[in-house]
Amino acid sequence: MSMRDPQILDIEQVIKSKAGKNAKRIPKFVINWFKNFMHLDYINGFLKEGYVGVEFCENAIRYLGVELEVEGLENLPKDGRKYTFVSNHPLGAIDGVTLGAIIGREYDGKIRYLMNDLLMNLKGMAPLGIPINKLGGQARSLSKLINEVYSSDNQMIVFPAGLCSRNIDGKIQDLEWGKSFIKFSRLTGRDIVPIHFDGENSKRFYRVATWCKRLKLKFNFAMMLLPDEMYRSTGKKYKITIGKPIPVSEFDKSKSDHEWAQTVRSKVYDL
């Protein structure tokens, strides 16, 4: 076993980087509260082991004691081509880590995610990520970066909703899916593999997300709850269902890319 570089998550630095010029106004007790709320000691206990990439994902599952039931492993293509793996996003953290472990193991670690900037602060995950700043703008540079990664020899893991699932009409489900995975998969000739992840966050998470929407808050407070939600997943069992690849040739001009994205979303929930 090679020597690993121990890591820690400096939540104080993360909070201050998000606060910008207002960082000095944040009371110390608020930062300390966040450290406790986010179970920083527990998280850093794992990060200090220094795992990186797919090894990080696999060992995070072990550390949390999460049990996985995977159906449809035979649907993971073995023809040497590059694919786009798309999934619903019910949990916002452990679902991404889990798919990284499953798909990364199958394809020798050659995977990439679209990843929010909070997760990019985890050094073990960062090498797998394409940074998407949910708290700021980067549209032009992001489009170019995404195209480059789709054109690479990495398998793409995408959560097209962008955010984790919400309580919509009393049902936990993704928001409307974005269309970019259709566009870039077509441009780079990638068939699409649908995946369904069965899971839910706490009721508290959905209440906070609902109030953020009602109050039209720019800052995504619900995202700051995700480390605690991941901690709550300790010892739980999740079912993942992998569907058969959808040929990219199906996504013709009979529908818009937006409509095709919702069609794939429906296929995922039918798994």
Language model features with spans:
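Residue-level detector of flexible, active-site-proximal loop/helix-junction positions
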Residues: 75-77, 118-120, 136, 199, ...
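Short, charged beta->alpha transition segments
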Residues: 66-75, 114-117, 140-148
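Conserved beta-strand termini and adjacent loop/short-helix elements that scaffold enzyme active sites
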Residues: 71-73, 114-116, 132, 243-245, ...
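Membrane-anchoring hydrophobic helices of lipid-metabolizing enzymes
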Residues: 1-83, 96-98, 126
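Catalytic core of membrane glycerolipid acyltransferases/transacylases, capturing the structured
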Residues: 39, 80-137
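Non-catalytic C-terminal accessory region of glycerolipid acyltransferases
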Residues: 4-7, 142-271
